[in-house]
């Protein structure tokens, strides 16, 4: 499922799950890095035992960032990766284990998604380069200077972040150096274990981590109260965290900041898009919006799985169940239901969209059907398909209604967009992409002079950053239609545009009148209504149209529909086992591009999936041949590249130069379905046998399935044991003693590629911060997880001895009078210190902040006399020297002052009851607040009025404090 969509839904519905991460500064005021002492207590008031890094979520933003200039070379990339790990480490400060997992060869089900992503990336890059070249040629034809083309080798192909490429091999070497450097030079690394699972170890990074956690949990030496922290941004990490059933599991990730500014692809400057680019011209005089935005380190946040469990336990609780309620089983069912909405291995059902509340709909249906099912949907990662069929039948009965409601919502949205655009054009805000901004009613429009090439253009008198960007963007697009001879004139007009003071000439007024007579929305400016919808799920016959368009069969082919539904259910069984037991089959995949309908699951209770056939993962180079487009062939051996481009290649059909993207009811191409041919595994592997003999020794090494490695420092209590294993130079696996390794179980063996302790370690990274180690103080050996029988089932339950974390949410039976005022928990620890002011601090605040805030807009009735306090009042002012000058600030005003001048002249009371009662008129101390309805002013009782808080009467003594709270009568007073 989409990461932003799911995370936005989750944090909106369960807000207490997220807390901001506290961290010590790693840079001083001059931007220089300063070391952080990670041996000190954790700044988040929560100590963590194990830190797991899903490394691909770190590698991608460090190698091709979207919010800053890209690194110049690989060495800078590696240095940024090290810096990123250091920052995460300094926030979490693990006390036992650091686990780094890089994506290895994935199961076939995941490879299909990887193939789609990489082919899309190649297609988008080609289209982007064509657009850049087209814009470059257009500017050069106008005689405008353009930046030189980037060198071919300067382009970083992000597809190289795939197992088996030379880049990933060099990255693994760099990470080994990084670990040795830290255990040698950083005291906080001295007593922990570090496990590195590089790209030669099969499996996705997050699932290699989950395999490790599952196998450690099955060992008696495991501490059931281990505090885990997993770093990664994928949405499925949340489900994986719940699936562990660990008592203390947390996720750390970057805070998602939408709408980040991006540099122009041609000139590298900010503030405009490629189509608006004017080449290498100096744009710094266009304001701050066109300069490079301030580079700010992104904040990190924690998502606390124990708090999410609290929410879900409340939500999934059901009264009068015909069986005993088990919260662990209910949580597993919740994870399973989320798979229907989206996952990396199956397309989501057409009737389920997360933005339409699909998960809530499924949970509601689940709670209704559980009384008929008389049991849970899943157990230990294996679904009960007869109960799944009941849920799907229930969803199928309302599919028609869901599709109709979706269409109604879309029509309503389009109508609102048209109305919004009309309003924006009416008030001169422009109509481009919803970026314009209407002006207030009391503000008259201003127009720039009509000389030169710029047409009259509405401009807000008070320029905001958004309006300035909009005006400058429109001016640029106008200027692009003219030749270089008009550049100076365009610049002068643009400068006049930005410096406009608001004067209008008679010609401007006439122009404005002519424009007012024109239609609000011109036909050529109407919003793109999106692709034509031929399926029309909201009309009768939708199922037949869907199957004919997507599968080229009619809906009357019942057998085919059931076959697709059975394949989908087989996929659900595979995904659930993948999350709870590990990979059930390396070669299974869903063989269709589209999902069936919920109403087609009518016979899935009869289906029995079979994953008993032994399978094995692809080799790294074989995976590259499965997921790479021909445009990324440079990462493959030379002879293997030819199979992707030569016309006589037996597998040339697997690498189409172009392919169709079915928008499938969506608006943007990235949301559509890439109709790529599925890889024929048998034909691919047979063809590759002819080029295997051409591999060099280095290429053969990259093509092997490798082991995990474990590192410790010289001061670790297991150092001598590790050294004995290393000096034996034996390939035999030796069991670990968990008591000497913080509870870690498994086996180790000699690593022939490791640098022995005491020897120099030459840095593979040519960077100032990556110096050679004169004396290596770390040791590395091969590591293997604990082994279990082939048919072993890992139980999905809370371990004995696990202590429940302290509850974060307010108890349902909390009584403020009986139990005291409830204090919400902020962060991990309810007893964490909170910021507060002493008496001197409060005095200083009252000294400098003496005026009240402005009141909100008041109630406006239909009659003329009821327009009381429509506008927000200004902040009041108290003259401490002369209490007679105790002004209420600006009164609410609104469209017209209240007609009763007698009440208005009661000096100072505007900030009190009058401002509060009529909503406006800030002043006195607290301000009028947002008055919501007319309320007569009571001079004798001096009440604050209805609103956000009535300010004090004008004659009160300092310090002034507003009285009335929102929505009730509050007596103003001072203390």
From Swiss-Prot:
Its EC number is 3.1.13.-
Q: In which tissues is it expressed?
A: Expressed in the pharyngeal myoepithelium and intestine. Also expressed in several anterior neurons including the sensory neurons, as well as the interneuron PVT and the pharyngeal motorneuron M5.
* Compositional bias ranges of the Basic and acidic residues kind: 804-821
Q: What is its main location?
A: nucleus
Give the induction note. Up-regulated prior to molting.
| MF term (GO), any | RNA binding
Point out which parts of the chain are CCHC-type zinc fingers, as ranges.
Answer: 262-279
Please state which protein family the record places this protein in: Belongs to the 5'-3' exonuclease family. XRN2/RAT1 subfamily.
Q: What is this protein called?
A: 5'-3' exoribonuclease 2 homolog
What lineage, starting at the top, does this entry show?
Eukaryota, Metazoa, Ecdysozoa, Nematoda, Chromadorea
Question: Which gene underlies this protein?
Answer: xrn-2
